[in-house]
Regions:
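Carboxylate-rich, polar loop motifs that coordinate divalent cations or form catalytic acidic clusters
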Residues: 4, 21-695, 730
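Glycine-centered coil/turn sites that cap beta-strands in beta-rich domains
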Residues: 690-722, 740-743, 768-771
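Bacterial N-terminal signal peptides
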Residues: 8-16
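Short beta-strand edge segments in extracellular beta-sheet folds
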Residues: 776-781
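Carboxylate-dense, calcium-coordinating segments in secreted/extracellular and ER-lumen proteins
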Residues: 531-535, 707-709, 755
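Short, surface-exposed loop/turn motifs with a glycine/proline- and acidic-biased composition
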Residues: 736-769
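Short, glycine-anchored, charge-dense loop/turn motifs used at functional sites
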Residues: 720-731, 758
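Bacterial N-terminal signal peptides that target proteins for export
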Residues: 1-7
C-alpha cells in the first residue's frame, strides 16, 4: 500500500510539470478542409447529418453535438470522394471515390470496404456516376454500364460491362431506368441484362440525372427540374416541369423530396404536387436537407445549422457549427512563424499553368484554425472582379497578423483580420500594367523591408525586383518614389519566380522560373536599402563540383542555411556552398552524393531526376524535400544520407505530389502540403534550446498499455542524454537530435523497464556534470 501511495504522489508531481503534448514520434495526422465555397452534398438522417465539402466527408451527431471528419486514419479506405448516397431504408451511407473504390458507413459508425471495382482491371473508365438502392442492394451506374453491390456482404453481386457510360440509374420494384446515349432507357428487373439490348428506349430523348421518389415516380435534375410519372407502360413516361432551373441539392424527407435553391426550397410529393417555400434573405438555401420535414439543416459558407420557418420567420434550432478546419484544400504555401502555421493556395497549377482559383488563406494557432480570406479588397485590373491566383506569402516579422501576398492580376495585398490594409500595383509603384500586374514571390529581410519579384514579360526596361522599405510599408499614399528598383540588366522573370534572402541579409537570390531558369545573385554588402554598393551576378549555366553541366530547367525552391543555398529543381537538388564565387564567375552548384554503402566507392546524386517542389530545414538542420511525384524525403543535414522516404505506399500520405513543406520552430512537427490537404508528421527532431531549464518528457506517465516511443524535448543541441533508474543504474543513453531525444522504454537488454521513476540527465559532453537531472519519467509496467 505504501508503494502505491508513493507512486501516486510521483504521478501527480510528474503530470504537473508536463506540457500538453501527446502525439507519438512517427505518427501522422491530417488537417481537414472546409472552405465554405465547395459544398457538394448534404444528407439529414435520423441521428446524423452527413455533408460533403471540398471533397471531404463530415458527419454531425445531432444528439451529442459531436462532429466527425472521415479519413483513412479513422477507418476510411481511400481519399478524393466523388459522391455520397444514403440508403434511407437500411440506414447506411455509400461513399464513392474518384478511383472507383467504395466504402459503406454503417449507422453505428463502422466502415466496410467494397474494393472490387477499384481492383478490377478494365480498358475503359470505371468512374461511378450514380447510385440507387433496393433493399441491401446498391445499383451503381458507371462509365462502362452498371453493377449491383450486395451492401450487406460487401461484394459485387452482378456487373454488366456494355462499354457504354450509364450516367444515371434508378431501380423500382419492377424496372431499372438508366440514362445513356442522351436518352432514358428501361428494362424489367426480372429480365436478363447481359446484353445492352435488354434496355428499351423510353419516350424521353434527353440525358438526365434521375432520382427516385418511390416505385411510381422520379425526379430529374439536369437543366430544368422535372417530375416523371411511371405508368403501366414504363417506356411511356409522363414528364412535367417543376422549376425552370436545376436544384443544387435534393434529399428525401419522409415520403417526399426536398429540392434546394439559394432563395427557396421545393417539397415534391410522390403524386407530383409541389410546394415552394421562400427562404429568408439572411439564409443561403443552396444546400438543405430534412429527414422529417420539421427542422431544416442548411450548409453554407459559414457552416452547418438547423432552423425552421413559420410565417416567413426563422427559428434557429441548432446554432451554426463550422468545423475546426483549414480553408485551403491545396496548400501551395506553408509558413510557420511565431507559433502559427499559415497556409495559402497558389495561382498556378502543378504544371505551372495559371488556374484562376480564388485566394484561400488560413492560419493555425494553439490547435484552432482561423479563416483569413480577405472579405473585401480593391480590384483594378481583374475582369473577374474577384481576388484570384495568389503567389507568394510573407508574414510581417513585427506583426504576425499582417499577411502579405502577391497575385497574378493585382500586384500585392496586405491583409489583417480579413481586411485589406495595403495594396501595391501599377497605380502606386514602379510596376507597370500589361494586362496584369503579377508579383510572384515576396520576402521580408531581417530589418523588415519587403522584397518582391515582378513578372516583367521580358521587358527588361522594367526591373524584376523591388524593395519597399520598412518605414513605407503601411504608408497611405504610396508613390513610385517610395520603392527601390533593383536593375538586373536583361534578367527576365515570369510567374512562379523564387526569391530567397539570407538570414544575415547579405545575399538575395532570385530564380527566373523561365525554361533554363537563370539565377540572379545579389550581394547587398549588408546595406539592405542602399543598392549603391551591391554586386550582382547572373548565373545562366550550372556546373557541378566535377565540372559537369547540371541541366536545370526550372528552379522551384531556394532555401538558405548559413549562407549555403539549397536549390530544388525539376531535375534534382543543387547546393551552392560558396556563394561568393558567383561574383568571379566561378560559382559551383554541388550535386550532393549519397554513398551506396554496398562495399564499393560508388554514390548516387541526391534525388537525381526527381522534381523537387519545396525544401524545409528542421531543428536538427536536416533537410526535407517535397517532390512532384514520389513523396517526401528526409536527409541528413548535409544531404549525404537519405534517412526517410515517405509515400502513399508506406505512410498516411494520400498523394505523392508534395506541394509545400514547413517545419515548426517550436517543436518536432513537420507540415506537409499536398494536392489533397495538409498533413502533419511528428518527427524525431526539434529545435534546440540555450539551456536545460525547460526540459520535459511525454507521454508522462507511461502507462502499461503504451508501447511507443518516449520523447524528451527542450534539450540543448546534440546533448548527451543518460537515463537511469532510482538507484543510479544506467538504463539507456544516446545523443539528442537537435533538442529532442527518443527512448523506446527498454533497457540495455531489450526488455521493458520495471515500474518506477526514471531520471533523465543531459549534458553537452561526457565530462560536463553541470546539468544534473533535467526531468523525470514515471513508468508503470
Amino acid at each position: 500500500m505504501i508503494k502505491k501511495i508513493c507512486l501516486a504522489v510521483a504521478l501527480l508531481i510528474v503530470m504537473a510539470v508536463v506540457p500538453a503534448k501527446s502525439q507519438q514520434v512517427g505518427s501522422w495526422s491530417i488537417y481537414p478542409v472546409f472552405s465554405g465555397n465547395n459544398n457538394n452534398s448534404l444528407v439529414d438522417t435520423d441521428n446524423k447529418v452527413f455533408y460533403l465539402a471540398d471533397g471531404w466527408l463530415y458527419s454531425y451527431d445531432k444528439d451529442n453535438d459531436e462532429s466527425v471528419f472521415y479519413t483513412k486514419m479513422n477507418g476510411m479506405s481511400d481519399t478524393d470522394i466523388s459522391g455520397i448516397y444514403y440508403n434511407y431504408d437500411k440506414k447506411f451511407l455509400l461513399v464513392a471515390y474518384s478511383n472507383s473504390n467504395i466504402d459503406i458507413v454503417r449507422e453505428n459508425g463502422r466502415v466496410d470496404n467494397v474494393p472490387d471495382l477499384k481492383s478490377v482491371i478494365l480498358t475503359v473508365s470505371k468512374a461511378i456516376n450514380s447510385v440507387d438502392f433496393s433493399g441491401d442492394y446498391a445499383y451503381i451506374a458507371t462509365d462502362f454500364g452498371y453493377m449491383v453491390v450486395d451492401c450487406n456482404k460487401c461484394v459485387v453481386k452482378e456487373s454488366f460491362n456494355y462499354g457504354k457510360a450509364f450516367k444515371s440509374i434508378v431501380v423500382t420494384d419492377k424496372n431499372i431506368f438508366a440514362t445513356f446515349d442522351k436518352k432514358i432507357y428501361v428494362s424489367s428487373v426480372g429480365e436478363s441484362h447481359y446484353e445492352l439490348s435488354s434496355f428499351k428506349e423510353t419516350n424521353i430523348k434527353q440525358e438526365m440525372k434521375l432520382l427516385k421518389i418511390d416505385n411510381n415516380s422520379m425526379l430529374t435534375t439536369t437543366g430544368w427540374f422535372y417530375y416523371i410519372k411511371i405508368g403501366e407502360d414504363p417506356t411511356n413516361l409522363a414528364m412535367s416541369v417543376i422549376e425552370k432551373s436545376a436544384p443544387s441539392n435534393v434529399s428525401m424527407s419522409g415520403s417526399n423530396m426536398v429540392a434546394s435553391y439559394k432563395e427557396k426550397y421545393i417539397v415534391v410529393s410522390p403524386d407530383g404536387t409541389s410546394q415552394t417555400v421562400a427562404m429568408p434573405s439572411e439564409i443561403d438555401g443552396s444546400h438543405l436537407s430534412t429527414i422529417d420535414g420539421k427542422g431544416l439543416w442548411n450548409l453554407d459558407s459559414k457552416g452547418l445549422k438547423e432552423f425552421s420557418i413559420s410565417d416567413g420567420s426563422v427559428t434557429i434550432l441548432h446554432d451554426t457549427y463550422r468545423p475546426n478546419t483549414s480553408t485551403v484544400s491545396e496548400p501551395y504555401y506553408l509558413t510557420y512563424q511565431n507559433g502559427t502555421l499559415y497556409s495559402m493556395n497558389s495561382g498556378r497549377n502543378y504544371k505551372g499553368a495559371s488556374n484562376g482559383k480564388s485566394v484561400m488563406l488560413s492560419s493555425l494557432k494553439n490547435g484552432v484554425w482561423n479563416k483569413l480570406n480577405p472579405i473585401k479588397v480593391d480590384i483594378h485590373n481583374n475582369s473577374y472582379k474577384s481576388l484570384i491566383e495568389p503567389y507568394g506569402m510573407a508574414i510581417d516579422p513585427f506583426d504576425s497578423e499582417k499577411i502579405w501576398f502577391g497575385s497574378f492580376f493585382e500586384g500585392i495585398y496586405c491583409i489583417k483580420n480579413g481586411k485589406q490594409i495595403q495594396k501595391i500595383d501599377h497605380l502606386n509603384s514602379p510596376m507597370y500594367l500589361d494586362f496584369v500586374v503579377c508579383v510572384s514571390d515576396l520576402k521580408f529581410d531581417k530589418e523588415g523591408n519587403l522584397w518582391f519579384s515582378f513578372y516583367n514579360f521580358n521587358k527588361t526596361t522594367y526591373a524584376p525586383l523591388y524593395i519597399l522599405p520598412k518605414d513605407k510599408l503601411y504608408k497611405e499614399n504610396l508613390t513610385a518614389d517610395d520603392f527601390i528598383s533593383i536593375d538586373l540588366g536583361n534578367f527576365a522573370t515570369t510567374y512562379g519566380s523564387q526569391l530567397c534572402i539570407s538570414k544575415d541579409g547579405r545575399y538575395v537570390l532570385l530564380g527566373s522560373n523561365m525554361w533554363k531558369s537563370k539565377l540572379a545573385i545579389i550581394d547587398t554588402n549588408g546595406t539592405l536599402t542602399d543598392i549603391s554598393d551591391d554586386r550582382v551576378a547572373i548565373v545562366a549555366t550550372y556546373n557541378d563540383q566535377d565540372g559537369k553541366n547540371f541541366d536545370i530547367g526550372y528552379i522551384h525552391s531556394i532555401k538558405e542555411e548559413n549562407n549555403k543555398f539549397w536549390l530544388g529543381t525539376n531535375t534534382g537538388v543543387g547546393l551552392i556552398n560558396n556563394i561568393k564565387a558567383a561574383f568571379s564567375g566561378n560559382v559551383v552548384v554541388n550535386r550532393v552524393k549519397v554513398p551506396r554503402n554496398d562495399g564499393t566507392n560508388l554514390a548516387d546524386y541526391l534525388l537525381d531526376g526527381v522534381s523537387v517542389n519545396d525544401i524545409a530545414i528542421d531543428g536538427a538542420n536536416r533537410k526535407w524535400f517535397g517532390s512532384s511525384t514520389s513523396g517526401l524525403y528526409l536527409t541528413s543535414s548535409d544531404g549525404s544520407e537519405i534517412l526517410e522516404h515517405f509515400s502513399t505506399e508506406n505512410s498516411s500520405l494520400t498523394s505523392d505530389e508534395i506541394t509545400s513543406v514547413a517545419c515548426s520552430t517550436d517543436d518536432n512537427r513537420v507540415f506537409i502540403g499536398t494536392k489533397k490537404g495538409t498533413f502533419v508528421y511528428e518527427s524525431d527532431a526539434a529545435p534546440s534550446q540555450d539551456d536545460y531549464s525547460d526540459v520535459y518528457a511525454y507521454p508522462n506517465p507511461v502507462r502499461p498499455d503504451y508501447s511507443g516511443h518516449i520523447t524528451v524535448a527542450g534539450l540543448m543541441d546534440n546533448s548527451l542524454v543518460k537515463i537511469t533508474d532510482s538507484m543510479g543504474n544506467l538504463v539507456y543513453s544516446g545523443r539528442s537530435t537537435g533538442g529532442m531525444f527518443v527512448w523506446n522504454g527498454l533497457n540495455s537488454e531489450g526488455s521493458r523497464v520495471n515500474t518506477g521513476v526514471y531520471y533523465v540527465f543531459a549534458s553537452q559532453n561526457e565530462n560536463d556534470k553541470s546539468s544534473g537531472c533535467v526531468t523525470k519519467i514515471l513508468v508503470v509496467k
